[in-house]
C-alpha cells in the first residue's frame, strides 16, 4: 500500500508497528486506512476541508503534531457516532446501507488508541493521550448504540 499521502508521524507509527511490533503488512495497512479515515474526519469536522468534500478525497499530508495535540475525546466520540450512523458500508451498493459493524468500529478504536499511545509513550511527541480515558466499557457502550 502506498503511504505517500500520510504525514511523516503516521508513516513512523506504521513502520514502528511493522518492524518493532512485528505486525503483518495487512494489519499495518488496515491501521493506515483506519487512521486516514479518522484524520480525514477530523479535518472535515474542524472546517479544514470544504463541507462539500467527499471524505475519501481529503488529503491528510498536512496533518502535524499541533493538529494531533488538539484532538479531544469528544472528537473521537463524534467519529464513532459517524461510523455508527453515517458511514456507508458498501459505497458501490445499489442501495447504500449506513453504519459500520461493531467489529469494524472496534478495530478503528484500537488503531486510534494505539496511535496515540505511540505518540505519547514511544515517540514522546505528545505529553497527554487524548484517548487515555476512553476505557473499554465506554467504547463498548458507544459501539453498542445504534
Where are the model-predicted features located?
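An acidic intrinsically disordered interaction segment
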Residues: 1-2, 68
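A short, ordered amphipathic alpha-helix with a cationic face
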Residues: 2-4, 143-145
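Onset of an N-terminal alpha helix
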Residues: 3-10, 28
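N-terminal core-binding DNA-recognition domain of tyrosine recombinases/integrases
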Residues: 11-26, 36-144
Amino acid at each position: 500500500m502506498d503511504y505517500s499521502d500520510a504525514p511523516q508521524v503516521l508513516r513512523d507509527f506504521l513502520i514502528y508497528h511493522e518492524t518493532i511490533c512485528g505486525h503483518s503488512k495487512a494489519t499495518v495497512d488496515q491501521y493506515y486506512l483506519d487512521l486516514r479515515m479518522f484524520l480525514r474526519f477530523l479535518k472535515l469536522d474542524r472546517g479544514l476541508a470544504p463541507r462539500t468534500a467527499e471524505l475519501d478525497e481529503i488529503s491528510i499530508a498536512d496533518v502535524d503534531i499541533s493538529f494531533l495535540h488538539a484532538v479531544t475525546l469528544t472528537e473521537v466520540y463524534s467519529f464513532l457516532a459517524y461510523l455508527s450512523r453515517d458511514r456507508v458500508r458498501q459505497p458501490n451498493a445499489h442501495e447504500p446501507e449506513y453504519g459500520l459493524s461493531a467489529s469494524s468500529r472496534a478495530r478503528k478504536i484500537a488503531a486510534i488508541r494505539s496511535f496515540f499511545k505511540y505518540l505519547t509513550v514511544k515517540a514522546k511527541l505528545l505529553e497527554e493521550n487524548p484517548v487515555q480515558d476512553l476505557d473499554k466499557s465506554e467504547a463498548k457502550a458507544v459501539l453498542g448504540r445504534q
